[in-house]
Amino acid sequence: MLNYLWFFLAALFEIAGCYAFWLWLRQGKSALWVIPALISLTLFALLLTRVEAAYAGRAYAAYGGIYIVASIAWLGLVERVRPLGTDWLGLAFCVIGATIILLGPRWSAP
């Protein structure tokens, strides 16, 4: 269960870092936004290595579902945009897929 904490923290820092670049490059904010962006993205990478997984690719694939949950939450909470029904439907499919990937090795064990 600690994996989910690492996934959610990693998602928070990844989205925050990417959003800082978005503010600079898409919304004309100060280039100083690069500093928190780089710090956030570094923390994202470090946190993702804390996940207990035998293979990086599987950890990243499972993380993708968590990232999408966090992105939709960011859309609503930070950007103040109400998610569409299709956002929720896509999110549900992604979470199911990420769960299958994350739990797959346990189901496949002899």
From Swiss-Prot:
The chain crosses the membrane at residues 5-25, 28-48, 59-79, 84-104. It is a multi-pass membrane protein. It is found in: Cell inner membrane. Pfam families: UPF0060 (PF02694). Keywords: Cell inner membrane, Cell membrane, Membrane, Transmembrane, Transmembrane helix. One of its GO terms (cellular component) is plasma membrane. Belongs to the UPF0060 family. This is UPF0060 membrane protein PSPTO_1628. It comes from Pseudomonas syringae pv. tomato (strain ATCC BAA-871 / DC3000). The lineage of its organism: Bacteria, Pseudomonadati, Pseudomonadota, Gammaproteobacteria, Pseudomonadales.
